[in-house]
């Protein structure tokens, strides 16, 4: 199967794929037995009974919505229906071939060889990754080798061998990709919603992302009552997962230990029982109950602390070493542990939804490196004040002041100039929570993601979304009349979309008008943006000059101005960034000489992973007489917008830079040009206020300034500048304009 065929999977029609179960025997885990009174609901041996869980053989939620398997179908028919729903959801969640290629590179099968004659073990990693193969004589989705090993390897019987501590690392030779999920207050979810959540988690597991779910029942009742609720909801979730015709669930309710009931320094009792079911492709459900070492009694633990302890264990940071162990041995142990697991996602399923902004819509994307302190301060103030209502008249009760970073934060909030008319535009009254408890919950979620992601690699990310949104997108489209057979469009699942793309559900740099505000959302008083928040540890953002200190404005004659020779600018890295992004060699001397007299500022993301060079351009025919009228007509121009090729399409680098430009540096507007055949133009179209194809040229002009078509003088100034810019490429060749 060619790689082009594999990467074209998302454009093929969806057909059922036959599933073949291969028998597999997994070694029994005999190491680190639990202490007295410590009970593991799961043994590493798949055949071991689970006495603490009793569930019906088939769990079918009471739902009349379309897209669910009819209840009168047999077991095989429901399996086929679930299979079809899985591929439909998968195909609808994919976006581009580049994103599919990125997903393949992150989740490709790892080739390994046995060490020291030890027989290699190929554990089962879920139906999709190891069991699916193309059936030419029956309808199927041609995924080629996208999710599976070669046919010879897949059909080779897996050898049986007993577990020994010396061979423990052999079991986890293939790296496990894990999503650590916190499900908040599942007792408030109806069966239909919980079924949709479970279906999505099963689909994530089949796509190679093993799920470990921590139950969070809240703090509304006493400890004894909450412990009972936690166990009941864990059983309930496990039953729904098992009814989804995918990977089975495995419930663990005593893998966490604490020194005492008053010392909440949590740690994982044993690594093996946690990784073993994940390696086998099971969905792990963790009850937040641990045992105190001093009393050997069960203690209900804070769910956030359980998530944090599990994240450190999965990241290989909880090292158990003896006092006489040398540093080399310890380092090798840490290295081996980190090769076993890749903790890729921290998922918070909370009815409260994404992180809100007290001034505007919920945050779509948070760059923790740049925004955490500002957003945490804002939420802390909200938890103290408790209520914010912005009505049609523009008045607000308990309105929160803009934080110290305010408009200088590129992703935190929309600047006042751009979205001040939002409530009037939507014709609605936008209300925030009526007490501070909801803001405190959001702050807890943000703090949890900040703590966990600070320990994880930069590639790891977090997402906060409501269970209802996940469940709604997990449904099939509603059937209409049987005559027309017209069906509504299937919604993209935010978790599957995030897995495939490693991006937020909506781009953080999209203007509000591009978000597709629906009438039903307007009437319900909901935010037009999706109520989910994508969180990355991210990267620092440098803006020169700093807008918090100096507003970006055209300089008067004789005033000192920023140049590319400034010692704060790493010119060789900037030139490399531009050349790598455009794929062309830059005439560096010509470029520096052209930019220096007119440089407005520079935006740099991370270690020159992305950036923008902005200038003040003089309209043709206008001479600098030093007057205010001349400075007022200077055109803010985006000369170069560049992202390293390895960072394009992932990590939100482009969004970070673009938001800084249009919301912080030039909130009143900026213009730029792009060749008419530039594939990035679609991205520009979505984020600009207007475009104009320059007659007689191969250029398209874009702007974010308000009222450009109505202001003819400004329009012709913009067009004149875009026509007159002289390129600085070393090859001296360019397309005919």
UniProtKB/Swiss-Prot annotation:
PROSITE patterns: GNAT_NAGS. Its main location: mitochondrion. Pathway: Amino-acid biosynthesis; L-arginine biosynthesis; N(2)-acetyl-L-ornithine from L-glutamate: step 1/4. One of its GO terms (biological process) is ornithine biosynthetic process. Keywords: Acyltransferase, Amino-acid biosynthesis, Mitochondrion, Transferase, Transit peptide. Its EC number is 2.3.1.1. Residues 43-78 are annotated as: Disordered. Residues 558-727 form the N-acetyltransferase domain. It catalyses: L-glutamate + acetyl-CoA = N-acetyl-L-glutamate + CoA + H(+). Signal peptide: none annotated. One of its GO terms (molecular function) is L-glutamate N-acetyltransferase activity. Residues 1-47 form a transit peptide. It comes from the Eukaryota. One of its GO terms (cellular component) is mitochondrial matrix. The keyword 4Fe-4S does not apply. It is found in: Mitochondrion. It holds the Pfam family NAT. Belongs to the acetyltransferase family. PANTHER family: AMINO-ACID ACETYLTRANSFERASE, MITOCHONDRIAL, N-ACETYLGLUTAMATE SYNTHASE. This is Amino-acid acetyltransferase, mitochondrial.
């Amino acid at each position: 199967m060619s790689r082009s065929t594999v990467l074209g999977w998302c454009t093929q029609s969806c057909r059922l794929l036959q599933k073949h179960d291969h028998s597999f025997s997994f070694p029994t885990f005999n190491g680190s037995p639990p202490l007295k009174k410590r009970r593991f609901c799961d043994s590493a041996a798949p055949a071991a009974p689970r006495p603490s869980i009793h569930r019906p053989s088939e769990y079918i939620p009471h739902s009349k919505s379309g897209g669910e398997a009819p209840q009168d179908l047999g077991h095989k028919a429901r399996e086929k229906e679930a299979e079809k729903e899985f591929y439909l959801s998968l195909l609808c969640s994919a976006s581009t071939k580049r994103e599919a290629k990125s997903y393949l590179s992150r989740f490709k099968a790892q080739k390994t060889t046995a060490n020291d004659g030890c027989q290699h073990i190929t554990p089962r990693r879920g139906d999709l990754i190891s069991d699916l193969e193309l059936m030419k004589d029956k309808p199927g989705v041609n995924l080629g080798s996208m999710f599976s090993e070669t046919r010879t390897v897949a059909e080779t019987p897996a050898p049986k061998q007993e577990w020994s501590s010396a061979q423990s690392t052999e079991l986890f030779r293939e790296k496990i990709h894990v999503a650590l999920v916190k499900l908040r207050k599942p007792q408030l979810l109806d069966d239909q919603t919980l079924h949709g959540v479970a279906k999505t988690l099963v689909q994530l597991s089949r796509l190679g992302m093993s799920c470990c779910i921590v139950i969070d029942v809240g703090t509304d009742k006493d400890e004894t009552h909450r412990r009972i609720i936690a166990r009941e909801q864990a059983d309930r979730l496990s039953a729904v997962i098992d009814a989804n015709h995918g990977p089975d669930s495995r419930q663990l309710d005593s893998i966490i230990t604490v020194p005492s009931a008053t010392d909440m320094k949590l740690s994982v009792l044993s690594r093996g029982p946690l990784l073993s079911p994940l390696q086998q492709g099971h969905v792990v459900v963790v009850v937040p109950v641990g045992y105190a070492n001093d009393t050997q009694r069960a203690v209900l633990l804070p769910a956030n602390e359980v998530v944090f302890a599990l994240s450190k264990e999965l990241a290989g940071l909880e090292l158990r070493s003896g006092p006489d162990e040398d540093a080399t041995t310890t380092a090798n142990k840490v290295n081996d542990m980190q090769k076993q697991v890749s903790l890729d996602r921290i998922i918070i399923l909370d009815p409260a939804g994404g992180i809100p902004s007290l001034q505007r819509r919920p945050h779509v994307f948070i760059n923790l490196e740049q925004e955490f302190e500002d957003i945490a301060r804002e939420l802390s103030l909200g938890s103290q004040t408790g209520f914010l209502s912005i009505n049609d008249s523009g008045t607000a009760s308990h309105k929160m002041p803009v934080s110290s970073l305010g408009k200088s934060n590129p992703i935190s909030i929309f600047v006042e100039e751009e979205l001040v008319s939002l409530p009037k535009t939507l014709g609605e009254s936008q209300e925030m929570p009526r007490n501070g408890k909801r803001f405190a919950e959001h702050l807890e979620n943000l703090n949890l993601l900040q703590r966990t992601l600070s320990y994880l690699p930069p590639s790891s990310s977090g997402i906060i979304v409501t269970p209802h949104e996940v469940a709604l997108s997990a449904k099939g489209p509603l059937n209409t009349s049987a005559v027309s057979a017209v069906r509504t469009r299937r919604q993209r699942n935010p978790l599957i979309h995030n897995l495939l793309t490693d991006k937020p559900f909506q781009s953080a740099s999209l203007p509000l008008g591009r978000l597709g505000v629906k009438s039903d959302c307007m009437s319900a008083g909901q935010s037009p943006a999706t109520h989910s928040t994508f969180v990355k540890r991210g990267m620092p953002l440098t803006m020169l000059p700093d807008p918090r200190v100096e507003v970006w404005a055209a300089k008067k004659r004789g005033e000192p101005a920023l140049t590319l020779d400034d010692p704060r600018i790493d010119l060789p890295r900037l030139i490399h960034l531009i050349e790598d992004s455009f794929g062309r060699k830059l005439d560096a001397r010509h470029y520096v000489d052209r930019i220096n007299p007119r440089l407005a500022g520079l935006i740099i993301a991370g270690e020159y992973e992305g950036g923008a060079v902005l200038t003040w351009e003089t309209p043709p025919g206008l001479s600098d007489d030093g007057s205010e009228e001349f400075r007022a007509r200077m055109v803010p121009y985006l000369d170069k917008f560049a992202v390293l090729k390895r960072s394009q399409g992932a990590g939100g680098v482009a969004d970070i830079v673009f938001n800084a430009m249009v919301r912080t540096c030039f909130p009143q507007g900026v213009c730029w040009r792009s060749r008419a055949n530039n594939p990035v133009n679609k991205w520009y179209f979505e984020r600009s206020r207007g475009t104009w194809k320059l007659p007689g040229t191969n250029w398209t002009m874009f702007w974010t300034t308000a009222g450009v078509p109505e202001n003819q003088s400004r329009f012709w100034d913009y067009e004149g500048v875009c026509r007159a810019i002289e390129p600085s490429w070393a090859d001296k060749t360019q397309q005919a304009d």
